[in-house]
């Protein structure tokens, strides 16, 4: 095999795989380097114990927080990346998310592109990723989005009751857009069966729309695309001028490998992409590759999250509860009294007894929790997630220790709107459940985060912008400092917004792909 390719992509997650898929029809030779292996298809894929208690598929890497405490990030290094384990919520950023927005805790900066630049790619990504939803329900929609190609996923009985409860309170709950291969009109032939093992699990049926099933696997037989798993990129080398990347150096079980490409794209995840650039410091890039702005690794975001766990006196009739969301408070409280953004509410996945044990394992070892008790509690739980925007701060950053380890310095910020929304949600559940408890990420140490979420929505670190002094990438996601380096994972985000970033990552990779196609024509 030749060691030179037209395009070398580091990472096979939503960004890297979507870019490869976009570029494959050009006939250009494409190499995808993935640190993980192919995920085994096995019974444990759907085992709550294996997934949440034994952490069978999660990385064993250790990162270190600002106090030097080690913790295991909620990351999965497999072909297809983290989307193999995500909850399949696929939402567009709102139009105002691309603009400068004043929050209670500071300013969320404007993006160098508008919603209009991504809109056609959002349309395409929603079709490709088979997003099920219903236009016209979400009060924050622009109103010009095309109808979803797939109908909204139906609500379980208890979720339908909750929807009515909120509507009676004047709220406007809507169907959460989900990427699943579901055909409810033909349940006996539908790939998706609306099971209890979706979010947090790999799908044994290949029914979840993720990078592995929709982007990577269709490329495996494409002759000009080569996927090499088990290759961790550890350094990028440049020519003597420092303007062009010449080599991607990988660490494998067999030793070091070196690959060259005319264009190099990094899509290793916000933390690992920043770490790779910092580890690639050289005489021409003494502070790290593409880091003349001193912004590589900075502005790390991962949303402010609170799980609201509600306990009912009666058994709650749910199998697939994650179908409902609320955006009434996204940009402020419609009741008045607070005109700053608060965030987004969505129902969470079904939580079995062993899932519950895994979620509390940082505080109470599973061996001390009787299985029957955990199961009985889980049958009466209804869980929701409040997502709010954290702001990009220079001091919230990824940096490397002397031994190359990843250090994550992070201080929670912009909490007022989030806490108001949590309190509003808990109050709204009065009369529907017996009691509600908020488990807030920002009240925990970084090494004791909710395991299901943790660092799952990592963003920023290599943000794009028009000014090389304050950004790492240009508006096409090419590094300001280099001629042939692009980044297409969530590193490029300027702000976090308050929704899952996957759909935006896919749409942007398509946009950058079209730009690269035009570049290669020249």
Language-model-derived ranges and their functions:
Residues 51-139, 332, 387-389, 394:
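Redox-cofactor-proximal catalytic regions of oxidoreductases
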């Amino acid at each position: 095999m030749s060691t030179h390719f037209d395009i070398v992509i580091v990472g096979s997650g939503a960004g890297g795989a979507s870019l490869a898929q976009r570029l494959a029809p050009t006939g250009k030779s494409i190499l995808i380097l993935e640190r993980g292996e192919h995920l085994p298809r096995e019974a444990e894929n759907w085992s709550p114990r294996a997934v949440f208690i034994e952490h069978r598929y999660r990385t064993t890497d250790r990162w270190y927080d600002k106090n030097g405490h080690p913790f295991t990030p909620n990351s999965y290094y497999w072909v297809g990346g983290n989307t193999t384990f995500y909850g399949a919520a696929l939402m567009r950023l709102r139009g105002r998310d691309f603009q400068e927005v004043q929050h209670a805790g500071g300013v969320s900066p404007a993006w160098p592109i508008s919603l209009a630049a991504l809109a056609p790619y959002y349309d395409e990504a929603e079709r490709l990723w088979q997003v099920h939803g219903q236009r016209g329900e979400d009060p924050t929609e622009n109103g010009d989005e095309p109808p979803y190609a797939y109908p909204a996923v139906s609500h379980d009985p208890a979720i339908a009751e909750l929807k009515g409860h909120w509507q009676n309170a004047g709220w406007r709950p809507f169907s959460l857009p989900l990427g699943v291969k579901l055909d409810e009109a033909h349940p006996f032939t539908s790939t998706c069966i609306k099971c209890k093992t979706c979010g947090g699990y790999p799908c044994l049926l290949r029914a979840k729309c993720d990078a592995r099933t929709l982007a990577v696997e269709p490329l495996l037989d494409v002759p000009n695309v080569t996927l090499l798993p088990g290759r961790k990129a550890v350094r990028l080398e440049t020519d003597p001028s420092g303007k062009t990347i010449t080599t991607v150096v990988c660490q494998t079980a067999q030793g070091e490998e070196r690959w060259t490409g005319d264009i190099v794209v990094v899509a290793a995840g916000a933390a690992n992409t920043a770490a790779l650039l910092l580890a690639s410091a050289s005489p021409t890039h003494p502070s790290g590759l593409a880091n003349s702005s001193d912004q590589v690794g900075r502005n790390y975001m991962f949303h402010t999250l609170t799980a609201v766990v509600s306990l009912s006196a009666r058994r709650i009739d749910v199998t697939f509860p994650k179908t409902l969301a609320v955006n009434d408070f996204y940009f402020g409280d419609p009741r008045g009294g607070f005109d700053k953004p608060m965030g987004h509410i969505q129902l969470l996945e079904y939580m079995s007894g062993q899932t519950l044990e895994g979620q509390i394992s940082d505080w109470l070892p599973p061996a001390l929790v009787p299985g029957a008790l955990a199961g009985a509690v889980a049958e009466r739980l209804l869980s929701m997630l409040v997502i709010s925007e954290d702001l990009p701060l220079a001091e919230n950053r990824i940096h490397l220790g002397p031994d190359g380890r990843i250090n994550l310095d992070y201080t929670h910020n912009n909490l007022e709107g989030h806490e108001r929304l949590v309190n509003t949600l808990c109050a709204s559940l009065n009369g529907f459940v017996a009691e509600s408890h908020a488990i807030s990420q920002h009240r925990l140490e970084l090494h004791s985060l909710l395991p299901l979420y943790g660092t799952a929505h990592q963003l920023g670190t290599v943000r794009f912008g028009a000014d090389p002094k304050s950004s790492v990438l240009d508006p096409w996601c090419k590094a300001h400092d280099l001629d042939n380096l692009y980044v297409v994972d969530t590193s490029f985000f300027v702000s976090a917004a308050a929704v899952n970033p996957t759909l935006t990552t896919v749409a942007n990779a398509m946009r950058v792909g079209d730009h690269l196609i035009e570049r290669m024509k020249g």
